[in-house]
Amino acid sequence: MTIYYMIVFMLLMVEIVSFVILSLPLPLKVRRAILNAISNSPFAGRVKHVLKITIICILILFADSVRRVVRVTKEYDLAIAAPSTTESARSGYKASQFYAQRNLYLCGSALFLSLVVNRYYLALEAMIAAQDKMQALQTQVEASTNNAKAVEELETLRTKLETRDKEYETLAEKYAAVTKTVEKKKDI
């Protein structure tokens, strides 16, 4: 395998490992810490830039692999049609067809997995942001619920105060009436 296909293979292995790490059922705090470390790291920014360039190179290798598979398949079909083709020539064509298909699948898998990992990472970031927003809204709801309970308690205390004020006024009126009658009796 040539050096550039070794690089593609290494990138494929890194993508598999990163996808497995991102897919692990980690607690929210750990997952948030991992995503924040990846998002905010200046080194990660450089790695993302290099990966974009590498993906473009892999796309070129993929196109070349498709072209090579088509060419090798046509050569093999022509060789099979020729009656003078030896068994060693056929095995040579089969070997070159195998290598061309291997390179095609290797590049295709690396491209596909890079798209999957990228989308999965973005979905995880969106999920973490949504969960943070949900937690903030829950704290607001709890605070408003506590405020609503306080307002409700204040209203019940107000109504109790109003009923006591009314009772006080009625008792004061009764007391005033009783004191008037007692004074009238004293005057007589």
From Swiss-Prot:
This is Uncharacterized protein C9E9.04. The keyword GTP-binding does not apply. InterPro entries: BAP29/BAP31, BAP29/BAP31_N. It is found in: Membrane. GO terms for cellular component: cytoplasm; endoplasmic reticulum membrane. It is a multi-pass membrane protein. Keywords: Membrane, Transmembrane, Transmembrane helix. Pfam families: Bap31. GO terms for biological process: endoplasmic reticulum to Golgi vesicle-mediated transport; intracellular protein transport; protein localization to endoplasmic reticulum exit site. The chain crosses the membrane at residues 6-26, 43-63, 110-130. It comes from Schizosaccharomyces pombe (strain 972 / ATCC 24843).
